[in-house]
Amino acid sequence: MSPKPSENGIDGDDERDEEEEDSEEEEAEEEEEDEPRLKYQRMGASVPSLLSADAATCIAVAERMIALGTHGGAVHILDFLGNQVKEFAAHTAAVNDLCFDTDGEYVGSCSDDGSVVINSLFTDERMKFEYHRPMKAIALDPDYARTSSRRFVTGGLAGQLYLNVKKWLGYRDQVLHSGEGPIHAVKWRTSLVAWANDTGVKVYDASNDQRITFIERPRGIPRPELLLPHIVWQDDSLLVIGWGTSVKIALIRTTQSKGANGTYKHMSMSSLNQVDIVASFQTSYFISGIAPFGDSLVILAYIPGEEDGEKDFSSTIPSRQGNAQRPEVRVVTWNNDELATDALPVHGFEHYKAKDYSLAHAPFSGSSYAGGQWAAGDEPLYYIVSPKDVVIAKPRDAEDHINWLLQHGWHEKALEAVEANQGQSELLDEVGSRYLDHLIVERKYAEAASLCPKLLRGSASAWERWVFHFAHLRQLPVLVPYIPTENPRLRDTAYEVALVALATNPSFHKDLLSTVKSWPPRIYSTTPVFSAIEPQINTSSMTDPLKEALAELYVIDGQHDKAFALYADLMKPDLFDFIEKHNLHDAVREKVLQLMMIDCKRAVLLLIQQRDLIPPSEVVSQLIAARDKCDYRYFLHLYLHSLFEVNLHAGKDYHDMQVELYADYDPKMLLTFLRSSQHYTLEKAYEICVKKDLLKEQVFILGRMGNAKQALAVIINRLGDIEEAIEFVSMQQDDELWEELIQQSFHKPEMVGVLLEHTVGNLDPLYIVNMLPNDLEIPRLRDRLVKIVTDYRTETSLRHGCNDILKADCVNLLVKYYKEAKRGVCLSDEVDDVSSRRGEKSVSHLGERTMSLKSVEVKSKTRGGGRCCICFDPFSILNVSIIAFFCCHAYHTTCLMESSISVGGKKEAGVAAQRTTSYDEYPNGVNDDYEDEDEEEEEEEDATSGALPMRCILCTTAAG
């Protein structure tokens, strides 16, 4: 495995031998490198100066401080940074073991001088106990500061384990065990005390003064004084033992006994404790220290050389050969699966043996461990002690994990780790920047661009920096789709640079179009983009997407006419809506062909509506000029046909062309066109119809040309339609043509029969019958003759009926005219209401004639040339009412009234006076039955107004 990165001067290295075989080195390089589980830091502050003149032997860790023992017999109290807080000159020989109580108020130490010293950290209290033999291990009661018994256990080379308890009369030692060799280690947890001697590990319950179990010393390992055993409580029930090359984990279980009443009764631990070995494995290295690491283990490993053996361990003096391996920190599972291995280059490691190293840990908040990670501040600390070094190891946190991933090029995993741990924005920025730099170096520009929204987030400055960086690398087009337009909004220059980069690269013209459509126009200026695009117009790099993008920019800039020209070239389907929206009818003039090709129907409608702006000559010339680009003749036909329907004469110059166009595209409409138009050449039209074999059209043209006989021959010989021939001859009103028709029909008896059926109203059937040859056989002749006679009678009857109706209409109209003519018109300066109403009704019935008569009378009155037909006095101009009749007689109103009364002195006159308006009889002998209803209406009107009936005296007398 490759060397681990250095942290604060400590390098991790997995090399075991600098002279390994080449094959092993290659295999190690091929293995995937595992991430370290721990990070290391050499303890500084006061420690280097302390160890420069002395050597460390052991260490103990409390919740708030550290105790370091030395060969000189001193106990140094340090904070976690290595600063010395206190110093106890406790012993005269090397300190072998240290121990804090749970509260961290007392520290106990034992030494080769045979003494045990317990010092209070916060008071001057100090107790010293002499045992006169080197003491190797000590453990304070976890509740030492809380109880008055002040218990501790200690042992050494004497082979006796002492329990020291404070009594009424002072401190008293109780020997818990003896006779099985020196006591090498002791640990106290709750009420359980575990110690190791030459035979193995034993556990004692201090609460009941009873030994619980014995765990035998592993076989095949050097003597305990050469390879010390290491024991540590992982929790209240798990005891971890590392001895030589063996690891065992013992579980001390508490069981419950069922009482007489069926309930569970809690009994004392000593009576029910059971010990199970839950894990056990062998190692390939010597164990110099062991500690729990969550649900795994941390082992301080000493790697033996080939010459290492029991003989070498017999000396406690450091080796002078200088060939020892570096100590290693290994993280393993309970099944000895290796999770991490780190070699520590401590000072002077070449000369140290396994017993020169020790390991202590501080698992104060181990309950926060979950999923391989500890909460911030709760991670355990591990202290590796060598004679001249103290190295702190602690679990790597999320930031360390991220840095390790970055150093190994796993930027994506680093980013995922940052996001999963909701890292600080500064860390995310750093990871993002390094990730992007890595991708840029690898030339993975597209991937880098896709990650920018996630990595740069809302930082406008970061976005702008990367925009210009991509631009410098000529890779800005791949970043454009991800550039934000809001939150954050960048400077206009950034967007303009992006658009220019897209515009100058034909491969990204489609992206330019989509970008222009999606970006708000307010965030950039179009001028730089115009400057980048316009030089490409009419060049090979002017692609359709670039044209459309330029058109969109013209729209944004308000240059709709330029945009229309580009849209027309691009044949955009919504071009017609664009024209209407921006009123661009003037611009249509130059783009007739494009409009026709987009949608010929809408184009024709537009051109017809705007024919004043775009004359037909312009349209026709553009379409003819495009003969190589499209079916221009079809477009011409559509346009000229619509133009002809709107205005028969608007396209008269092209009617000759239209004849041919109709013949090609719409022959059914040609005949209608020929009948409606007067602006085409008959000869040319006839040639086209002959060429296209359009028979009816030939007949029509021949008829207009005066070749009626030739037209008739076409009908009979080509069409074979005798009815059409009869209709044609009837329209020509030429007797000779009838004879021609009859003569040509004789050759076809069936035509003669049809001719006989259609002669009524046109020819005398007898004339045709007389001309028929005697031997001519006519199919269904009898039936046809019967039909001829029947049709003739029907025609005669219809004519008589029509004559009768005509006569009746004449009589009715004459009577109506006479009745209107009998009415008078009052001419006066002041006309009463009744006369006005009656005059208005008369005017409405008489129309223009009444008004003209009134004009004549007014002029006569003005001139004064008229005379009353009764008194023969001339009419005065003022203050005299005059009654004028359509018979050209006029009277003074007073004269006419007096004459009417005198003439009507008889009874009939009285009756006539009571009626409003009536006529006794008409001069022509027609009675009043024709207009009874009209007269009744007239009488009702006169009766309502109270006026007397007015009649021309002269005409009435003459009629009588």
From Swiss-Prot:
Pfam families: Beta-prop_Vps41 (PF23411), TPR_Vps41 (PF23556), zf-RING_Vps41 (PF23555)
WD repeat locations: 90-132, 178-214
Ranges of Acidic residues composition bias in the record: 10-35, 928-943
UniProt-listed GO biological process terms: cellular response to starvation; endosomal vesicle fusion; gravitropism; macroautophagy; protein targeting to vacuole
Classification via InterPro entries: Clathrin_H-chain/VPS_repeat, TPR-like_helical_dom_sf, VPS41, Vps41/Vps8, WD40/YVTN_repeat-like_dom_sf, WD40_repeat_dom_sf, WD40_rpt
Keywords: Protein transport, Repeat, Transport, WD repeat
GO CC annotation, single: late endosome
Domain of life per record: Eukaryota
Region spans: Disordered: 1-39, 917-948
CHCR repeats: 607-754
Protein's job: Required for vacuolar assembly and vacuolar traffic.
Family: Belongs to the VPS41 family.
Name of the featured protein: Vacuolar protein sorting-associated protein 41 homolog
UniProt source species: Solanum lycopersicum (Tomato)
Taxonomic path: Eukaryota, Viridiplantae, Streptophyta, Embryophyta, Tracheophyta
Protein's gene: VPS41
